[in-house]
Structure formats: structure tokens, C-alpha cells
């Protein structure tokens, strides 16, 4: 069907059914190929599949210019190509895309989704809702508020207006937190801009680059971001160094505003000392944000929850279920102890969209959101009180509950990303999440132990590592090369050669040149990392000779 014929009845349901069946015939073999490649990933080399063919299910690698030629993408300027053209394009996309379902994908801080994730994306596509106002997305609004409130409760945000909203990824959540911090601590900035203030944001030297991006976006400039030194071994922020930098900023006539602490840094996976950092923030009246995009889901695990000790002291917190929890990309929550603060910082009059602070009398009354789920509580924590002027805090205490969620964010168009976590939570339960998190951490520890036991490698990460990435150098003859450029060249060459064996891993710069950064996830098998080590040993001999 290439359009609507006003003289014929709609038959969209049958068309959707037919196309879903046709696409299903393409995507199921794609996923199955990854499942069938498990023996190859355990072996460290490609093995014949069930049909006797040797195939790299992870990726059919091409250079960009070659892929442009192979795809030969054309967007018809006249009549469309219909179902045949659609299915051929989908087939090509699958053929030339990285199969993140493959065990060998250990490259970035995310992995494949899972069967529930696929279903959730399908449902969102069918609904095609915009969760900006309650009127057009009633069920999804209730789900987002309840899911965010329950998730916030795990981090110790347990007040009556605790909760959060989803944003378009962790960078967007972090950006939104900075806007909220500025407009809360300095309300005049919402209408007058930054004026003559020279704000300073503080983040770990190992923190995510999104803080600098946000500073640029907010008109502060990247130079407004001051990086705080970390402990050389653990990679954790030095709270005493933070305090000194805050004092220096004040002495220079600047306005310290915001501290970004990290739960799971991008390279080493470090968890900053939140209690010590919170003490500095309290002393100087700074906004404390925790970027738990990567390491936040450890909160589900009794064994690893301690890494987030002090998270309840934050004024806001980012967590991305699409990273550690195999929820489809993107799914990012910005959480806090009081969402009235979010609303006051971001709300603007838009009478054509926001008709009232609560649903109209003709709309069904939304239920009161409470945290009655049977999640495991975090002991001895209570939420940080809101920051801001006394009269503003009083207004928050009297604020009505907000159901038009776009009014709490920088967005208008909002996809219902919370549904993806909600359905996964309903399917697996908090206990299932705990098992997944514990398994992933155990696999990371297993890989670190394998690396530490071999003379071919030198571990950079702690053993066990704090999060799910394991960092190490290749050490020919039991020794890392003195020349940094040699180490970098070896690492990059070995990473490239791994692809032909069915593995994708990353590398990062270090004191002795670039080293391997391998990221495992909740679906990674121990045999997979054992196979990876076998492959690295073999490739190392090829590269070094």
C-alpha cells in the first residue's frame, strides 16, 4: 500500500500483520545466528555453523566508502518500491549492521536488548504516542511516573514528590540536571540568562564528556568545566581536591554551581566517594548530581549496592537502563528527591499545549502514585532536602502533582521510553534484575582474573574491577613495551584483528599508550571471555611475532 485511497476502506491491520510476518522472517535468523555463534566465541575463532559454513555473525565489515557502494541507497522521487523494496532494504541493513546479540560484542557501554525489549519497541511503535501531556498519553504517563518513582526509591529518594522523568539519553539527562541546578540555585537565570555570573561546573577527570557538551549548550562554555583529579589506582574523585578547586573558583570571583559525581566511569568503571563529595557540596551550597548512567543498576544487587553508598544525598541522578540492563536504546531517567524542583526550573507558559496543571474534569482522574512495590529497600538513607530560596521551597511544598511531563523537561516531543523498563521489570522482577547484575559483575571479575593469571597481559583495572569493563595491556614476553606508541599500535592492531574472529572490543588512552577496554554485560557467558583471551593470545603472537 502506497497511500490512502478515499474510496476504499482502511485495511491497515492486515497490512501491518503481513509486513510483521515478512520482517519476522528476516530478524529471527539474524538473532539465531548470534545464538549459534556461541561455540565460536568460546573457541576464540570462527567455527562452522549448523549448515557447515564458516560465517562471522557479528559483522560483515566494510569500509565506509565500500558500504556506500554496497547499499546503493536510493530514496524514490516518484513511486515507492513497495514491500519488495522495503524488505530488501531491511535485509541489507541486517547484513551490514553489527549484531549486538552476538556474544562477541563487548565494545561499548551497552549491549543487545532481549526478547522483552523487542516487544516493548514494537508496542511503542504501534502506539506512536507523545508523552508530553497527559491527555494524549494517559496510560504511558502513569507508567512513567510510577516507574520513575519506584526507581528513585531504590536510590533513596523516598519523599512524597520523589521521582523523575525520562530524557533522550544520558547526555540529555545530564544537560537537564545542569539547567535545573542553575535555575534552582539562581532563579533569575531562567529569564535573564547567566548575566555576569561566571559559573563553574566540577566533574571528575574521568567523567563523561557530556558535562562539557552541556556547558557549551547552556552558554557557559567548555572552560566552565573544571576537572577534579582522581586517585591514581581506583580512578575515584579526590574530594579534598574538589574542595580546593571550589575555593579557588571563589577566590577568582567565579560562582561554583554544580558537581557531577560518577557511578561507573567510562573507562575504569569507578564509583566516586559520594558521601565525601556531598559534604563538600553541602559546605559550599553546590548542586550534587550523580551520573549513574552506567553503574547505577548496581542498586538492584545486594552484593554491589554498597558502591552507591551516599547516592541519596544527591539533588539529581541519571541512570540509563539501556546500558547495563539490556533495555533497548535509549532509556534514560533523570531522578531526584523532589520533582517539583524539576517543574519549577523548566516550566514555561504554552497555552496551546499545557491547558492546566492537572487533567481536565472530563478526563479520567489519574491514580495517586505511591511506592508500594516490593523492591528491596536501601537501609539508613533519606533524601537530600531541595536546594533553592526559602520561598521557592515553600511553593514546592504546596505544589500540585504535575501530569504533563514535558513541563518537567527541556523536551516537547517525548517518546515513552519508561515503558521499556516497566515491561522488563514486570517480566523479570527486581530479583531477576539482581541475578542479571550479579552475573555480569561475576563475568567481569572472571575476565580480570584470567588476564591477571597470564604473562601475556598486564591488568590496568582493579581485580575485581569496580564495574563491567576490564582494562589491560598486551605484554609481549611478560612486559609492557617502554614506547607508548608501540603499545598503542599493538593494541589497535589487535583490536582490528579480533573482528575477523568474531569479537569487538574497544581501547582507551593510558599512561603507557592505549590499552584494551572490554565491556561485558548481563548476557555475556564466562566461556565467551575465556574464548576472547584465547583469541588475544593468538593474535598477539601474530602482531608481535
Located regions from the model:
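N-terminal entrance/gating region of PLP-dependent enzymes' catalytic architecture
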Residues: 2-161, 502-504, 516, 532-536
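Active-site nucleophile and cofactor-binding loops and adjacent substrate-binding regions
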Residues: 139-140, 164-171, 203-204, 262
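Short loop-beta-helix segment that forms the pyridoxal 5′-phosphate
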Residues: 151-179, 226-229
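Short Gly/Ser/Thr- and Asp/Glu-enriched loop/turn motifs at secondary-structure junctions
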Residues: 160-161, 196, 462-468, 509-515
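Conserved PLP-enzyme active-site core in the AAT-like
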Residues: 173, 179-343, 347, 360-362, ...
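Active-site C-terminal subdomain of aminotransferase-like
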Residues: 265, 310-455, 462-463
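PLP-dependent enzyme catalytic core of the Aspartate aminotransferase-like
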Residues: 389, 510-545
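Conserved PLP-binding catalytic core of the aspartate aminotransferase-like
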Residues: 459-497
